[in-house]
């Protein structure tokens, strides 16, 4: 027997990077590139543990770990975003588009909750896909990103559902913590 039937949830809230879109490797490469001028080599595993956190937070963590000043944060984030947008090779995971269409056809409310900026999300040229979501929550809409619960709480609020009526689909430790803190 299924302990968590999907029918108990009115809303499904999805992360984007690494859940719907195959973006993890492109993101890692962009972060690694952005730190080269500072003599910092980022390990793939280190980045994946931070995936989902706001970009400025990720930059701060790597700068502090390497005993560099946080005055470089904005330059690093800008370099990372520009590199990502110029070099990405975006695609969805298999079955994602069909899953979203099926959930909508079965009356589920859908939210996309991502730490990415609105500009970066729109830069993926998937507007028709994004239009299937009832709510989009991007990193620039919240004052505290993942692992803080604010992004998922805002998603539930905008969908007009309680947190117990929400199911979160996440891949990253920061996002999972965010969802748990939001009691989803």
Segments from the language model and where they lie:
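Substrate-recognition "cap/lid" segment bordering the active-site pocket of phosphatases
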Residues: 117-167, 173-181
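Active-site neighborhood of HAD-like aspartate-dependent phosphohydrolases
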Residues: 1-46, 181
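Conserved phosphate-coupling serine/threonine residues in phosphotransfer and NTP-handling enzymes
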Residues: 19, 114-116
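Helix-loop "lid/cap" segments that line or gate small-molecule binding pockets
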Residues: 34-35, 54-68, 156
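Short, acidic loop-to-helix structural element flanking the phosphoryl-transfer center
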Residues: 2-3, 8, 85-112
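Metal-dependent phosphoesterase signature
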Residues: 63-98
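Conserved SAM-binding loop
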Residues: 20, 92, 110, 144, ...
